[in-house]
Amino acid sequence: MTTELHDDASGRLIVGLDVPTIAEAEKVVEELGNAVSFYKIGYQLVFAGGLDFAKSLVAARKKVFLDMKLLDIDNTIAKGVENVAKMGVSMLTLHAYPKAMRAAVEAARGSDLCLLGVTVLTSMDNADLREAGYFDNAETLVLKRARQAHEAGMGGIVASAVEAQAIRQAVRPDMAIVTPGIRPAGSEKGDQKRVMTPADALRAGASHLIVARPIVGAPDRKAAALAILKEMRSIGRS
C-alpha cells in the first residue's frame, strides 16, 4: 500500500530505538514524551523482546517502523508479512528484490501496513558494493531498486537522502522515501557514509527521516529531538 506523506514534522521524524534493552527503550520513549510519535525498532531490540514492545507502543497510539530487512523465499516472506500486518505497526522493511516485494505486497493487501524496500544501506559506498560483487555504483543501484519497488506496488523505499531527489523523480509521488543517515550539522557520521542534514534531506525529497544516535545518544534527548523538529518545520513540505 501507499502511505500519506505527513505535513507535520512530528509525523515525519522516526526515532531509531537502537538500544540494547526494553528498559532503555522505555526510558527513551518516556523522555521524548509527546514530542515524538514514531519509532523504529530493529534487530537489536527485536532480539531483546522488541516485538512485544512494538505492540505496547501501538497500544499507546505511537507509530512503529519495524526494520527487519526481510529477504527469503516468496512463501516465507508472505507468511511473515501477514503476521506483521496483524500487529498494527505502520512500516516494515524488506530488501528490494522484485520477487520478495511482490510476495510481500500481495500478503499485505487490505491492511494498513506500509512496505518499504531497502535499496542500498547508507553505511555502504561504491567500494563496498564492488567488494560485494555489484557492478553498479550506489546511485545506479538505488534507482534501479527504487523503480522495481515502484513496479511491485510497494509503499515506499529506504535510501540515502543523497539519492532522494533522483528517486523522487523516478517513482510515484505518493511513495514514501524514508532516509536514514540523518546527521544534524556538526555531528559525527559514525558508521554512516552517505549522510545529510535534516533540512537538506527534506529539500531533496525525503518524506520521513530516521534519526537514532543524534537523539538517543544526546545528553538531553528531548531537546535534541525538538531541535531537529524545529529544523524540519523551517523547511515545510518538500
UniProtKB/Swiss-Prot annotation:
Entry keywords, A to Z: Decarboxylase, Lyase, Pyrimidine biosynthesis
Binding residue positions for substrate: 18, 40, 67-76, 122, 183, 192, 213
GO MF term list: orotidine-5'-phosphate decarboxylase activity
SUPFAM superfamilies: Ribulose-phoshate binding barrel
Keyword match Repeat: no
Catalytic residue positions: K69
Signal peptide positions on this chain: none
PROSITE patterns: OMPDECASE
InterPro entries linked to this entry: Aldolase_TIM (IPR013785), OMPdecase (IPR014732), OMPdecase_AS (IPR018089), OMPdecase_bac (IPR047596), OMPdeCOase_dom (IPR001754), RibuloseP-bd_barrel (IPR011060)
EC number: 4.1.1.23
Pathway membership: Pyrimidine metabolism; UMP biosynthesis via de novo pathway; UMP from orotate: step 2/2
Main EC class the enzyme belongs to: lyase
One Pfam short name: OMPdecase
NCBIfam families associated with the record: PRK00230.1, pyrF
Family membership noted in the UniProt record: Belongs to the OMP decarboxylase family. Type 1 subfamily.
Role played: Catalyzes the decarboxylation of orotidine 5'-monophosphate (OMP) to uridine 5'-monophosphate (UMP).
The protein, known as: Orotidine 5'-phosphate decarboxylase
Organism in which the protein naturally occurs: Brucella abortus (strain 2308)
